[in-house]
Amino acid sequence: MAERESGLGGGAASPPAASPFLGLHIASPPNFRLTHDISLEEFEDEDLSEITDECGISLQCKDTLSLRPPRAGLLSAGSSGSAGSRLQAEMLQMDLIDAAGDTPGAEDDEEEEDDELAAQRPGVGPPKAESNQDPAPRSQGQGPGTGSGDTYRPKRPTTLNLFPQVPRSQDTLNNNSLGKKHSWQDRVSRSSSPLKTGEQTPPHEHICLSDELPPQGSPVPTQDRGTSTDSPCRRSAATQMAPPSGPPATAPGGRGHSHRDRIHYQADVRLEATEEIYLTPVQRPPDPAEPTSTFMPPTESRMSVSSDPDPAAYSVTAGRPHPSISEEDEGFDCLSSPERAEPPGGGWRGSLGEPPPPPRASLSSDTSALSYDSVKYTLVVDEHAQLELVSLRPCFGDYSDESDSATVYDNCASASSPYESAIGEEYEEAPQPRPPTCLSEDSTPDEPDVHFSKKFLNVFMSGRSRSSSAESFGLFSCVINGEEHEQTHRAIFRFVPRHEDELELEVDDPLLVELQAEDYWYEAYNMRTGARGVFPAYYAIEVTKEPEHMAALAKNSDWIDQFRVKFLGSVQVPYHKGNDVLCAAMQKIATTRRLTVHFNPPSSCVLEISVRGVKIGVKADDALEAKGNKCSHFFQLKNISFCGYHPKNNKYFGFITKHPADHRFACHVFVSEDSTKALAESVGRAFQQFYKQFVEYTCPTEDIYLE
């Protein structure tokens, strides 16, 4: 997994071509933009798409980018300087076994390994095949037990299951029972596939996960490759177990490897439960103008995965290609159609409960009995990855308060965005039309109040947006009736009122508890909504306050620096310090804010730097300030672990804070019309005075006389 992440990081994007803040009227030079591009996986936002990106990096189906091991002359001279070659060179150390299989020059080694493994097994003769021989006769295995599926042949391990298992045994890793060994073999043997008779593949055949290119000068079009990570031994065993339906036709010399690949794909359509299974790209129905196109070209065979996994919520968007699933690619399709989704190796829809479509010629017609019970999908995640369960809700429905369907990755990925180069310029394609539900820079203020995922929500303390987990890193304070009050409690659960006197709560809402009744109901003021009411006591917890002696020391100091800035947002980061973490957070927030700047501009605020900490006071209009209560956000200085401005654009400033109770960190990003060097120096001065006062209190130098 670490190698995959390093390989992904190798595709760092180039500097953006335009400013992310097109709606901000800031008197600044034209080069006012982020110029320090950091790979987006250098900090975690705990979103499902990053988990998908880490686990299924080979899902990106693109003819210029292949992250699978090189097969059949993939690394040709024409593609040596491309970005795909560079990425593939870094991904050679992935956790797949036999990464160098099927490369030109490795065919002899593969046959030698087959001979050695066959010699070690009693009763199995060596396969009669040579490096330059057509692989079709290999399906007529001469050894006893190789012509039928009755004899179990152990395979080389491709997953964590290091010991061979007998058929129908229990998979102790995934708690999945293996499927039947003979049913799929019989179906494959009964199929009348043109691939087994030496015919060429259709001209528009779909490119599966590997998206491999044929060698230069080869007349064979790109073949349909399987999704398994089998070793050469397993591939030879799979082809031997499938008896030919007729006399095999010997392919020309230049087509030997391609024909073998087709036979291998035919035999390995159904994978076992112990292998890693990668999802195939999402399909779409052929265009009316292209009745002969059975499958999409490779540049359009891009999978779309949304963080809201409701299959019934998707609808068909005619005439638009499929974007990629990762945030580094430019498109993100939240309108994937279930009719276009096909599992690995067939056009069946057993998961959706629909009748199977007409089968392809290369597959068996007896696919109606297949279901997700026969194939177990394994999700491989990092040990530190966190999955968040979200409810299933329609994509076209109104965005509710707890909606997670409009995540930052939905909004960050717009193909026609000039700032898309900050996410991934190497994967750019032709501009694609955006679905109507995805936000863009064309959004207007009269649109509904769209709420982003709480994993990645920009914090605007003006009450217009939902609270996020980043707000629990500090303390709220409000001026109520001319007197400033600090937050006393924080909501830990959502509470939906059922009576008029009850107070609605969202997670992490700042609360000012005014009365604690004996029946375990609190009467409180919600600083986010400005409403009062009662709620159950166990729906909120008391916030951590600074010690009284430290508060007294801070009150004795009258030094306060104020700076006028614009608050861009907050994002959770994995580390408490580092310029790379700070720049990555600035990059992510700037990209996100660019898409919402028209209907939700950044809030003007005043940063107050003192010995106590950093206070963010929202500077609203006078009319709004007269109507409501003025709120601010406060971060104790002891919880601030790192601060600084962008090394290549000092108009951006950010600081990292630690959660008072949990081991979590968040970065808060601001932008100013002028340089923020003075702001960073002021925070450094506050640190020095705070440390001096803390040392004087804890380690006094006065002589102490005891009577």
Curated annotation (Swiss-Prot):
Q: Where is this region: Minimal inhibitory domain (MID)?
A: 153-172
Q: Which SMART domains match?
A: PTB (SM00462), SH3 (SM00326)
Task: List each copy of the PID domain by range.
Answer: 557-696
Identify the main location: cytoplasm
Basic and acidic residues composition bias: residue spans = 263-273
Specify where the region named Interaction with MAP3K7 lies, as residue ranges.
279-467
* Entry domain remark: The SH3 domain mediates homodimerization.
Keyword Repeat belongs to the record: yes
Task: Output one GO BP term.
Answer: vesicle-mediated transport
Subunit composition? Forms homo- or heterooligomeric complexes. Binds specific components of the JNK signaling pathway namely MAPK8/JNK1, MAPK9/JNK2, MAPK10/JNK3, MAP2K7/MKK7, MAP3K11/MLK3 and DLK1. Also binds the proline-rich domain-containing splice variant of apolipoprotein E receptor 2 (ApoER2). Binds the cytoplasmic tails of LRP1 and LRP2 (Megalin). Binds the TPR motif-containing C-terminal of kinesin light chain, KLC1. Pre-assembled MAPK8IP1 scaffolding complexes are then transported as a cargo of kinesin, to the required subcellular location. Interacts with the cytoplasmic domain of APP.
Q: What family, per the record? A: Belongs to the JIP scaffold family.
Q: Where is this region: JNK-binding domain (JBD)?
A: 127-281
This entry's Gene Ontology molecular function terms read: JUN kinase binding; kinesin binding; MAP-kinase scaffold activity; mitogen-activated protein kinase kinase binding; mitogen-activated protein kinase kinase kinase binding; protein kinase binding
Query: What does the UniProt function comment say about this protein?
Result: The JNK-interacting protein (JIP) group of scaffold proteins selectively mediates JNK signaling by aggregating specific components of the MAPK cascade to form a functional JNK signaling module. Required for JNK activation in response to excitotoxic stress. Cytoplasmic MAPK8IP1 causes inhibition of JNK-regulated activity by retaining JNK in the cytoplasm and thus inhibiting the JNK phosphorylation of c-Jun. May also participate in ApoER2-specific reelin signaling. Directly, or indirectly, regulates GLUT2 gene expression and beta-cell function.
Residues the record lists as Phosphothreonine modifications: 103, 201, 407, 444
Which terms are listed as keywords in the entry?
Answer: Cytoplasm, Endoplasmic reticulum, Membrane, Mitochondrion, Nucleus, Phosphoprotein, Repeat, SH3 domain, Ubl conjugation
InterPro entries reported for this sequence = JIP1_scaffold, JIP1_SH3, PH-like_dom_sf, PTB/PI_dom, SH3-like_dom_sf, SH3_domain
UniProt-listed PROSITE patterns: PID, SH3
Name of the protein? C-Jun-amino-terminal kinase-interacting protein 1
